[in-house]
Amino acid sequence: MASKTYTLNTGAKIPAVGFGTFANEGAKGETYAAVTKALDVGYRHLDCAWFYHNEDEVGDAVRDFLARRPDVKREDLFICTKVWNHLHEPEDVKWSAKNSCENLKVDYIDLFLVHWPIAAEKNSDRSVKLGPDGKYVINQALTENPEPTWRAMEELVESGLVKAIGVSNWTIPGLKKLLQIAKIKPAVNQIEIHPFLPNEELVAFCFENGILPEAYSPLGSQNQVPSTGERVRDNPTLKAVAERSGYSLAQILLAWGLKRGYVVLPKSSTPSRIESNFNIPELSDEDFEAIQQVAKGRHTRFVNMKDTFGYNVWPEEE
C-alpha cells in the first residue's frame, strides 16, 4: 500500500501516503530528523507549508538524502507546500512560491496550495498584520473574490516553478466559486478527515469535480470531542478493529482513508511511528464497514483557527 499512487487532474502521479512536516514542538533539528527518517523508510511525498517555518530543515534533509542516495532523484520525490493567508496578493503568492523553493532547496514545487480560503493583510516585512485584538486583519476583498490570488497560482504553473496547484480547507461553496473562474482547476483539496469528521459530502464533491481530497489529521486528534470527552483513539469499535487485525490503530485509520480513495498525510517525530505509518495494510470489507459505522453521522472538527484568524470558515458549525 505504501507505493500506491493516484493520478492528479494534471496527469501527474501523487503518492497516496505523504509525510506531514508540521512540527508540534518545533525544536531545532526535529523536522530534519523526522524527514530524514521518513525518506529512509520510503516516503516520497512530503507535505510542507510556509506557515510551518521549517522548510529549511525539510530542504536540508532532502538535499542530504539525495546526496547519499544516488539511486533516488529529485523527480522521484513529490513535494507540496502552501501559501499562507497574508500572502494572497498576486505578487506575494509568487514571492511565497519562490521563497519556499529557496528554503526547500529545490528548483520547482510539485504541488502548491492556498492554505486557507482567507486572505489577510501583511506588514511591510511580510509578517502577518494583527489588529488591536491580536487577531489577523482580514482582507475582505481577496477573501470574497479569490480570482486575483488564483490567477497568480495559475501563472506559477505556466512559469514552470510549480507543477500543480490546489487548495486546503476549502468548502463546497468556495470550491464552486473557484471552479467558475479557474482556468487551471485545483488538483487537490487538503482537508481534515478522520472517523470523527468523515466529510462525506465534501469528499464526494471533490471526486465529482476531478479534485483529489487529501486528509490531514487522518488519525484524529489528541483533543477530546468537546461535547462527549471521547477521543478517536479511545473509541471501542476502532480499537477492536485494530486488535483483531494485528495492526496499530493508526495503521487501520490510514488504511480506511486509502480505501476511501484519497491521500493520507500522517505526521510523527517518533521513528517507530514514522515507519509503521508507512506500512499500511489492506483493510478488509468487514473492517472498513465497521469504521464507516463509527464515522456515520459524525462531524467533529479539531482544527479550526478561527480564534487566531478572527474569521470562521465554518460558521454553520457554531
Curated annotation (Swiss-Prot):
Reaction catalyzed: glycerol + NADP(+) = dihydroxyacetone + NADPH + H(+)
Residues where substrate binds: H115
RNA-binding in keyword set: no
Enzyme class, first EC level, given as a word: oxidoreductase
Keywords linked to the UniProt accession: Glycerol metabolism, NADP, Oxidoreductase
Cystine residue pairs: none
GO biological process per UniProt: glycerol metabolic process
PROSITE patterns according to UniProt: ALDOKETO_REDUCTASE_1, ALDOKETO_REDUCTASE_3
Gene3D superfamilies the UniProt entry points to: NADP-dependent oxidoreductase domain (3.20.20.100)
Catalytic site: Y52 (proton donor)
Protein family per UniProt: Belongs to the aldo/keto reductase family.
Functional note: Glycerol oxidoreductase probably involved in glycerol synthesis.
Descriptive protein name: Glycerol 2-dehydrogenase (NADP(+))
Species lineage: Eukaryota, Fungi, Dikarya, Ascomycota, Pezizomycotina
